[in-house]
């Protein structure tokens, strides 16, 4: 086996040494050929042996360029044919062999480079033929979407690094909490069943499963840790949980809207549920009967990075529910339209051009005593439908303000007497009964219809009560799925107050509602303020030849049918529930059946603030007084304002024996002031009045305090009774 190895270039030899070098090279070539020849033949010539060695060296070089690994050689040897000549004969040196091998090596490199470039070109053509490029516009849109997704992903990663969660992350947390709550409820039901059957082994397994499922209940775990910290007197830990885990939000709160056009206020209760805090609003009827509240917002807490993440959620109710009452009347009673007007008590017939119209779809020549189409044979279905009953039909010529108040008091008394429903049915005529409807309408027709039979307008006052079937609230949502969760923000100001900010998702709708509400006034009240009764000012039942003009339609509502909503910012303050039995401290509610408001009485010492702040008081006299602040207001005096005040103490007590009837049970009488104003809290002013403290012995759960005030036009008594909020 022979190999051709190139040597390093050397300096050119002198001319005299060429012959000697040729001879030495030829002798060395002969000796090398003899060394490489495996079977030397002395008879063969040295030229053939040199030629074969050169051929073997070329084949070895080709194999080495192709990638074959040659046998390791300790030394590189020169195998080439050297022609020695004298004079001008050319001599092929090892440098010439090195140049030839370099050229052959560059040729193989170019071959491999061309092959690689061709393969890449064919692959590009193949890919381009099967996946054509998209247009530039689509590429730009796709690029924008990819960039936006990357930005959202980066933003989410940054927020998670900072301890904040994105809204999408919170929505996943909401779904996880709902599923966990459902599983816990099912396991607790099985646990009660196992305990009832005395299967304690299964009960133990179920308790372990409940504990494992409740690992996402951050709120429940925080409440448990708070109770443990208080029992173990670890007050620093308890303070941290109260301030950072939301435990300090539990309890009753009164809310005042930041919108000046909303004077009504809210009473809410925040309670702890699975994985969240839920705030429910209550009206006066629900507070009296311990009824269920209406959820308005939620507060979620989640553990992250050794702390707590908070997310407030506004429960936006379905807007279609607000129109359900009108739709129910229109569908079940066969009416075309129901519109609320803005007239008041005692308005005349000419002032009702924009009143509420309830047009009969099946107008014919029948008498009005037969009742409009749709009142008889109401279709029955599984949907809970309000049942209408007529309480009283009286000609308007016999109606005054006292009678209207009496009617509303009667309606309030009947709502309180829920023990015997048969008496309630006997005292009123069900509108579903055709005979009763005819008798009621005939009673009003006998006094108002002319004998000539000509067409005339019959003015009457109809008091109508709505009762839901099967104790179901047809206006309230059946579950939390009826709400839409919207992001909100909760800002804690201190331990006793916080602000709740809703998402501005319907600014235009809010402005329209506010403008509409400000115009809907019923006497001295507004339609939205009446949670207990919606007052439609004018209803026309258009028959064949007679019209019934109803100036007032009181619709009693049960179980919080008027949904209270949050818009913009609402400021909440904690309701302080007093422990003492002081009659001049605590919560009170008006005792009238149709105008229920909640007040907070507080004893104070100093000087009450006068409306005219520029007036300078020369004598700084301090005294003890009591203020009544409205927690729920109306269109006259909004929530958060002082409605009456009085100086208390022995120096300011007035005599009452022989002046006030003993039946009222007056204990003390003080001089005070009552605030009155025009609608919209315009021109507020103070009038003289008296605060009375009653013993409440003559009336069960009767009033405890009363306020008597007078103006140039009327004298009015207001009675108030204690309001006890459930723990």
Swiss-Prot record:
It is found in: Plastid, Chloroplast. It comes from Oryza sativa subsp. japonica. Pfam families: Cyclin_D1_bind (PF12014). Keywords: Chloroplast, Plastid, Stress response, Transit peptide. This is Protein EXECUTER 1, chloroplastic. Residues 1-51, 65-102, 340-381, 413-455 are annotated as: Disordered. InterPro entries: EX1/2. Residues 413-441 have a biased composition (Acidic residues). GO terms for cellular component: chloroplast; thylakoid membrane. Together with EX2, enables higher plants to perceive singlet oxygen as a stress signal in plastid that activates a genetically determined nuclear stress response program which triggers a programmed cell death (PCD). This transfer of singlet oxygen-induced stress-related signals from the plastid to the nucleus that triggers genetically controlled PCD pathway is unique to photosynthetic eukaryotes and operates under mild stress conditions, impeding photosystem II (PSII) without causing photooxidative damage of the plant. The gene is EX1. GO terms for biological process: response to singlet oxygen; singlet oxygen-mediated programmed cell death.
